[in-house]
Design a protein with these regions (language model features):
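Membrane-embedded alpha-helical segments of multi-pass transporters/permeases
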Residues: 69, 136-140, 169
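Transmembrane alpha-helical segments of integral membrane proteins
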Residues: 132-148
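Short helix-terminus and kink motifs of transmembrane alpha helices
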Residues: 64-68, 72, 148, 152, ...
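Juxtamembrane boundary at the C-terminal end of a transmembrane helix
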Residues: 169-180
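Cytoplasmic-side transmembrane-helix entry/capping segments in multi-pass membrane proteins
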Residues: 151-160
Length: 180
């Protein structure tokens, strides 16, 4: 295999891993933050918010891992059907699945800690701040690794997360009921 082709394959493998890790972490952060903000907006107490967040973490991790496994398996099967040998294909379904599962769970822990911490009166604000900081870091990291604009990546991440949390919180507030 020529050196440039080997370099291309190494870069492809690195970018696939990075994509899965960033997508998994961002999805964990944003999905679970949206869930817990919606439940908090409905007026739920700390244990209820924590339970909803844990359920979202578990379901999301399994979903991301399973989805990544299916996606990478299909990619691998397609490449092999077009004549590439199994050794030439950089698609590793189980590795990708595990990476997405762990990345989602790692990202999801942050909003859970922020919303259920000892700062009850500021739980929503703490969550928003923690999520903005975390997504700024993942946005910068993705831009650095991909040699693209950190500002664009960070702004994109932060806007999506603020919209997700704001809409979820508003829906929770509008539809929430107080349980006596």
């Amino acid at each position: 295999m020529p050196m440039s082709e080997a370099n291309d394959r190494a870069l492809e493998k690195k970018l696939n891993w990075l994509r899965a890790a960033v997508l998994g972490a961002n999805d964990g952060i944003v999905s679970v933050a949206g869930m817990v903000m919606g439940v908090a907006g409905a007026g739920a107490d700390r244990p209820t918010v924590l339970l909803a967040g844990i359920a979202a973490l578990v379901a999301g991790s399994i979903s991301m891992g399973g989805g990544e496994y299916v996606s990478v398996s299909a990619q691998r099967d397609t490449e092999i059907s077009y004549g590439r040998t199994a050794e030439e294909v950089n698609a590793h379904p189980w590795g990708a699945a595990w990476s997405s599962f762990v990345a989602f769970a790692a990202g999801a822990v942050l909003p859970l800690i922020a919303i259920t911490g000892p700062w009850e009166a500021y739980r929503e604000l703490a969550t928003v701040l923690a999520v903005v900081v975390a997504l700024s870091i993942t946005g910068w990291w993705a831009a650095w690794a991909g040699k693209s604009s950190p500002a664009k990546s960070i702004i994109r991440n932060v806007i999506i997360s603020l919209l997700t949390m704001g809409i979820s919180y508003a829906i929770g507030t509008l539809l929430g009921v107080t349980v006596l």
